């Protein structure tokens, strides 16, 4: 390791582990005060994290440092606040429109990776690895089993992935490629809407055909690129080019804060409440007076004075 690299790493002091994972820390830059995430990953991922550092996108945490040390790779990346989709889905399903929008943004996140030379395949797209930030931005937060496509290779050298999201080729039938990630996007789309995997229950309606095409056993029968999947979702569902998903705690918060009280009682401000009481009393008395007057007119043909 170069002396300059060692100096840059020493700028970051470790504060605590993240989620009890021994290889991920929250760190702080001693000079700037910047809070960041430090990961210790396989050195085999150096080319991938170097690409992420050199080609930043809004859909992936910024990589500040990517330094090899003692046969390991030290990555310093952007610290994000928010919830991953798995956490969100513990309390609520995601509406069809929101789920489609999230997948569209994931397609945009994967596009530069799949178009890289050689192509980068995530291989572990799942709810726990997708974060919705407090700003409602979609981020892929884990590339620890990503790989680069190797021309002429019949299958992956290491079989890796998450069971429910893994495409058939991840079990050794053939080499993984961009269509492997498309398979996982189909699983994720179904899971967000139903909180069930396609093997348990398939989504109904207009997205069913899209999910089924993503999940074809033969990669040649799936959408061939994320561009194709994005276009289908856009044309079939919504034009969401400039929108951000609203998925997250907002749903529960909006429902909790929504008040069904009469006007004047919703703000819980004392003078507004008092004014409302006096107003409603006046209106009630006026209505009662008019009712008596109307009744007397019907009985006598003339109004009481």
Where are these regions (language model features)?
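Conserved catalytic-loop aspartate of Hanks-type protein kinases
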Residues: 181
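ATP-binding glycine-rich loop module of kinase domains
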Residues: 11-50
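Conserved activation segment of eukaryotic-like protein kinases, specifically the C-terminal portion
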Residues: 155-169
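Conserved HRD-motif arginine in the catalytic loop of eukaryotic-like protein kinases
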Residues: 222
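Catalytic-loop of the protein kinase fold
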Residues: 114-132
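Conserved HxN/HPN-centered segment at the entrance to the catalytic loop
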Residues: 56-65
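Activation segment signature within eukaryotic-like protein kinase domains
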Residues: 102-103
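Conserved short submotifs of the Hanks-type protein kinase catalytic core
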Residues: 70-84, 88
């Amino acid at each position: 390791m170069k002396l300059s690299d060692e100096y840059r790493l020493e700028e970051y002091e470790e504060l605590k582990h993240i989620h009890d994972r021994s290889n991920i820390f929250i760190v702080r830059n001693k000079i700037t005060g910047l809070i960041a995430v430090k990961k210790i990953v396989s050195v085999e991922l150096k080319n991938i994290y170097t690409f992420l550092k050199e080609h930043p996108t809004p859909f992936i945490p910024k990589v500040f440092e990517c330094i090899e040390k003692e046969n390991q790779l030290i990555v310093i990346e952007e610290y994000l606040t928010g919830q991953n989709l798995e956490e969100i889905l513990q309390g609520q399903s995601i509406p069809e429109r929101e789920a489609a929008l999230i997948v569209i943004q994931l397609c945009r996140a994967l596009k530069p990776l799949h178009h890289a030379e050689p192509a980068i395949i995530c291989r572990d797209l799942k709810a726990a690895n997708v974060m919705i930030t407090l700003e409602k931005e979609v981020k892929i937060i884990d590339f620890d089993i990503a790989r680069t496509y190797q021309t002429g290779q019949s299958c992956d050298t290491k079989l890796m992935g998450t069971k429910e999201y893994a495409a058939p080729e991840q079990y050794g039938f053939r080499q993984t490629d961009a269509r492997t990630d498309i398979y996982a996007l189909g699983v994720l789309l179904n899971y967000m809407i139903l909180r069930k995997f396609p093997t348990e229950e398939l989504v109904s309606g207009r997205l069913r055909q899209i999910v089924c095409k993503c999940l074809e056993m033969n990669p040649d029968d799936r959408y061939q690129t994320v561009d194709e999947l994005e276009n289908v979702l856009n044309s079939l569902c919504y034009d969401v080019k400039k929108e951000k998903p609203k998925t997250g705690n907002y749903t529960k918060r909006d429902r909790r804060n929504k008040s069904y009280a009469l006007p004047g009682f919703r703000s819980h401000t004392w003078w507004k409440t008092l004014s409302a009481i006096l107003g409603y009393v006046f209106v009630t008395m006026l209505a009662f007076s008019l009712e008596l007057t109307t009744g007397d007119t019907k009985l006598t043909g003339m109004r009481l004075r």
